[in-house]
């Protein structure tokens, strides 16, 4: 017994020595300071995941504006000086922004690699998204989203709104239902040819299917951070089933039965069929990736925008006046006779108050991370220093450090609806840090060539949502003094953070 214990003790000691020798990176000359963490493989992952912002602030104070941390088997160089961000952007020949995203998509959604270098497809997905989510294509999306938002808000649940009584709901649940249903109809089409085809039975059937898809989406989305981290989805049986059900609805044979499908999905179906070797299930899972990308950040961004708007009387007053002025200038009248309010892209772009509210809400809730993978050993040249970076290491920017910097944003934890308005009430685009003008001051959508191609549509649909809510509804928080919910840190690095709890509110149709 004693001998066995001694043997096991020796084995443990040898394993520890082996890990110490091979599992710990030693800093070479010219490299940033490195922190390996105490846990094999995980390194600093648990500390970082618990509260990324505080973790990075502490390391910034200890090591300076650039440092390296081992996180889940990868060595990540965090760059914290916003004046050095452009140095990362301009050294693109050494850094690959696609590799990390392609790998994360394959792990999370279960399709084969979408990296053209791996031979499954020759589609340039980033160009597909730019082509179908910006320019003239954006105008069609805005038009469709306006119609679908009003259908969902006013017709999809008319039984609740017939009387003049208040309807009580969870604010996040409300935003989730409205934005998911409207966004799904806008991108993936309807089961009817036009609004005139919608009888009650068809409406209820379509709504039941989409709300069922929403439940599957939420079940799958809950474990999304774990999937990106590399945990196999089979560990999560219910989430795995939810993902497969979502994908089943997006098979090409099912999508072809739908009407008014967006240009994005139509083009992706064509390119999947002509440029890829994916089977039907993998094609569907690439569409699931589009669905997730269109909803996972837009829904919480909508919630935070509406929550801060309702909570601030000054913001409510300014936003309501802007909406009324914009509708009046457009000759749009608010009524409930079935005629939709219609604002085009130019009119929506000329709403700086709503734009500032959305930006401020996203500044307070965004925890995205800009990631680049080193293609080779190279020297990262910053304005005043140079650092050696090893092949396959990750260079990361964490914009929440920027967004919460009191030297850039006075009282950074407080919502100020006019923070992004200048003295003339127009968009403010000039910000300073320690007296020096910043090139990068607002980065919820990433930066450079990897900037989210759907960002324009996302902002426009939130702006449409707020415009319609302010136009059609009286809306109040049940508790006007309710504290702001905490941010769910489990999703840090993925975009807009969800609230840890919902907020109760009430709404009813205005007497028009």
Predicted regions and their residues:
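Central I-helix of cytochrome P450 enzymes
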Residues: 268-328, 361, 396, 454, ...
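N-terminal membrane-proximal hinge/A-helix region immediately C-terminal to the signal-anchor transmembrane segment
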Residues: 2-112
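Cytochrome P450 heme-binding "Cys pocket" and the immediately downstream C-terminal segment
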Residues: 315, 438, 443, 455-492
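Cytochrome P450 heme-thiolate monooxygenase catalytic core
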Residues: 139-302
């Amino acid at each position: 017994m004693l001998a066995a214990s001694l043997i096991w003790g020796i084995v443990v000691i040898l394993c520890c020595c082996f890990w110490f020798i091979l599992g710990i990176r030693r800093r070479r000359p010219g490299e940033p300071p490195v922190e390996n963490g105490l846990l094999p493989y995980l390194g600093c992952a648990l500390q970082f995941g618990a509260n990324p912002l505080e973790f990075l602030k502490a390391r910034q104070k200890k090591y300076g504006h650039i440092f390296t941390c081992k996180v889940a088997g990868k060595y990540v160089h965090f760059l914290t000086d916003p004046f050095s961000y452009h140095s990362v952007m301009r050294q693109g020949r050494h850094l690959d922004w696609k590799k990390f995203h392609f790998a994360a998509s394959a792990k999370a959604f279960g399709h084969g690699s979408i990296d053209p270098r791996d031979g499954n497809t020759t589609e340039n997905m980033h160009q597909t998204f730019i082509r179908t989510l910006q320019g003239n294509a954006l105008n069609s999306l805005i038009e469709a989203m306006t119609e679908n938002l009003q259908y969902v808000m006013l017709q999809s649940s008319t039984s609740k709104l017939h009387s003049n009584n208040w309807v009580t709901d969870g604010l996040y649940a409300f935003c989730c239902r409205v934005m998911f249903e409207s966004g799904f109809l806008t991108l993936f089409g309807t089961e009817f040819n036009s609004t005139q085809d919608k009888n009650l039975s068809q409406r209820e059937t379509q709504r039941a299917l989409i709300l069922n898809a929403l439940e599957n989406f939420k079940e799958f989305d809950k474990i999304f951070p774990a999937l990106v981290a590399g945990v196999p989805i089979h560990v999560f049986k219910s989430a795995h089933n939810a993902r497969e059900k979502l994908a089943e609805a997006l098979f090409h044979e099912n999508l072809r039965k739908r009407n008014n499908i967006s240009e994005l999905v139509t083009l992706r179906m064509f390119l999947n069929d002509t440029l890829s070797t994916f089977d039907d299930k993998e094609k569907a899972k690439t569409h699931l990736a589009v669905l997730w990308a269109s909803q996972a950040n837009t829904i919480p961004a909508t919630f935070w925008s509406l929550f801060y708007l309702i909570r601030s009387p000054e913001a409510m007053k300014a936003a309501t006046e802007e909406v009324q002025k914009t509708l009046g200038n457009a000759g749009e009248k608010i009524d409930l006779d079935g005629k939709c309010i219609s604002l085009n892209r130019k009119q929506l772009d000329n709403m700086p108050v709503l734009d500032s509210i959305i930006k401020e809400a996203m500044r307070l809730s965004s925890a995205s991370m800009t990631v680049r993978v080193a293609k080779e050993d190279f020297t990262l040249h910053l304005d005043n220093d140079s650092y050696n970076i090893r092949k396959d290491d990750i260079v990361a920017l964490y914009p929440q450090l920027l967004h919460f910097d009191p030297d850039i944003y006075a009282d950074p934890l407080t919502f100020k609806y006019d923070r992004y308005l200048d003295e003339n009430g127009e968009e403010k685009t000039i910000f300073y840090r320690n007296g020096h003008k910043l090139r990068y001051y607002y980065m919820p959508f990433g930066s450079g060539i990897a900037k989210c191609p759907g960002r324009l549509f996302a902002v426009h649909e939130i702006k449409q949502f707020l415009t319609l809510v302010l136009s059609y509804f009286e809306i109040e928080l049940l508790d006007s003094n309710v504290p702001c919910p905490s941010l769910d840190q489990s999703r840090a690095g993925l975009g807009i953070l969800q609230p840890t709890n919902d907020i109760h509110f009430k709404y009813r149709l205005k007497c028009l």
